[in-house]
């Protein structure tokens, strides 16, 4: 019979081998460094996520890289709309407004509109899309049909094929990606990405000179994402 101490050692070795197998599997799928994988997996484990979730996400990124833009947008949008359950921050994080990194969202498998949008943005960047093509947009979303005057704060991701083009909207509420002209229920307030902020969300060109520092939650999110190994 194996002693309790012996059992602990066996289980410890088994757990270590599982972690090693997860690392190897992920590295075979992607081109990020071992150090970055370890950082991301550490965050995933800290929040109770399974390595298989991380592996599926990295597989999505690698499979999306050679695809055309429309297919890339569709696959990433569907992945998060399917994998993540909409839940308010207070239930997930015990805070009224917490912006989670993609790894934190994957670990919890739950999040609100900001978390969906942030995860899609970073995933598409990793899949080869440019910062110039994407903005996170704060909107007022109309609730209750075309005649309703009731709105609530919401966030979506917008893709621009060119600076002057009508954006396509990626939304956790509607899986179909639609042009902005078909989302009359959304009233843009302002837009931003890791390069800066546009006070007029429909404006093209150079973002506000004040930069991302105006959004303290976004600035904090970027720091945490960078610490986890994300590049932007």
Predicted regions and their residues:
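A structural boundary/capping signal
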Residues: 2-3, 31-232
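Bacterial N-terminal signal peptides that target proteins for export
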Residues: 4-21
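Mature extracytoplasmic/luminal segments of secretory-pathway proteins
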Residues: 8-11, 27, 110
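Short alpha-helical segments used as structural interaction elements across diverse proteins
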Residues: 15-16, 28, 117
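Bacterial N-terminal signal peptides
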Residues: 21-28
């Amino acid at each position: 019979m194996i002693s309790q101490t012996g059992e602990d050692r066996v289980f410890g070795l088994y757990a270590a081998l599982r972690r090693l197998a997860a690392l190897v599997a992920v590295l075979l799928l992607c081109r990020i460094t071992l150090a970055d994988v370890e950082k991301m997996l550490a965050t995933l484990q800290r929040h109770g996520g399974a390595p298989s979730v991380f592996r599926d996400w990295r597989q999505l990124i690698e499979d999306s890289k050679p695809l055309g833009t429309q297919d890339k947008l569709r696959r990433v949008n569907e992945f998060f709309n399917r994998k993540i359950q909409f839940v308010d921050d207070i239930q997930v994080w015990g805070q009224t407004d917490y912006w989670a990194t993609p790894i934190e969202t994957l670990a919890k498998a739950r999040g609100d509109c900001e978390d969906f949008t942030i995860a899609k943005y970073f995933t598409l960047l990793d899949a080869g899309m440019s910062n110039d093509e994407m903005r996170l947009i704060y909107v007022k979303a109309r609730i209750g049909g075309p005649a309703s005057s009731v709105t609530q704060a919401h966030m979506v991701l917008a893709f621009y094929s060119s600076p002057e083009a009508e954006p396509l909207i990626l939304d956790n509420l509607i899986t179909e990606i639609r042009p902005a002209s078909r989302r009359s229920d959304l009233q843009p307030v302002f837009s931003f990405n890791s390069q800066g902020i546009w006070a007029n969300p429909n404006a093209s060109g150079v973002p506000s000179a004040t930069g991302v520092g105006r959004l303290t939650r976004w600035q904090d999110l970027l720091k945490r994402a960078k610490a986890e190994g994300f590049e932007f």
